[in-house]
Amino acid sequence: MAVERTLSIIKPDAVQKNAIGAILGRFEKAGLRIAAAKMLHLSRDDAGGFYAVHQARPFYGELCDFMSSGPVLVTVLEGEGAIAKNRDLMGATNPKDAAAGTIRADFADSIDANAVHGSDSAETAAWEISYFFGQREIFAH
């Protein structure tokens, strides 16, 4: 299996719950390494640019409002099969559908306030990582 990089965002709801350490610990326990990290308070424009792919969807405005409502922790995770591994750790988008023991089952409140974001493909990961990080900010292990 190839070593990959994926973007993960710990969203405002999980930051407010002081769940950053618990979530990062799950990534590390699963064999993912943190190659980059920064805490940010996104502007609505920042959130809108990041989620531009969803611009035509009915939830876009609320998503941008939520993602700019408080600080987030943006990380680049690295490891074998990192994209799929991160998505498995996160669980289903709607925490009501998330398997027990996943991040969303344990920390999310709703489909909107669902604790974490993770890239869904290698192409998306490359774009998402470049949205937040320059090459000099990412460190291979």
Swiss-Prot record:
Major role in the synthesis of nucleoside triphosphates other than ATP. The ATP gamma phosphate is transferred to the NDP beta phosphate via a ping-pong mechanism, using a phosphorylated active-site intermediate. It holds the Pfam family NDK. It comes from Acidithiobacillus ferrooxidans (strain ATCC 23270 / DSM 14882 / CIP 104768 / NCIMB 8455) (Ferrobacillus ferrooxidans (strain ATCC 23270)). The keyword Phosphoprotein applies. It is an enzyme of class 2 (transferase). Signal peptide: none annotated. This is Nucleoside diphosphate kinase. It catalyses: a 2'-deoxyribonucleoside 5'-diphosphate + ATP = a 2'-deoxyribonucleoside 5'-triphosphate + ADP; a ribonucleoside 5'-diphosphate + ATP = a ribonucleoside 5'-triphosphate + ADP.
